[in-house]
Amino acid sequence: MHQVILCTCPNEASATQIATTLVEEQLAACANILPKIKSVYRWQGKVEQDNEYLLLIKTLETQFQPVKERIQELHSYDVPEVIALNIQQGNKEYLDWISNSILL
């Protein structure tokens, strides 16, 4: 099954580094960087707000663990967001491209 993994980053440089590494290492076929999202969350008992960058990482379900581990190695957050959403349907040619772009 194909997946989109969500990961927030503190800045564009961090998002670009993680995205580039995952694609270069063929853990992901593609990663989109959405700029300047606003996150509201609870951290250490306080409600926080930050501007962040959101990665949309296209990969395969079998690659979730290696992608998660690589993000944790590269990320500056103590607890980085790494959430996978299964792709139920999509353009077959695009999904085939994802499959063929990942090193298994």
What would you call each of these model-derived segments?
Residues 1-104:
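Positively charged, small/polar-rich N-terminal and surface patches that mediate targeting and assembly
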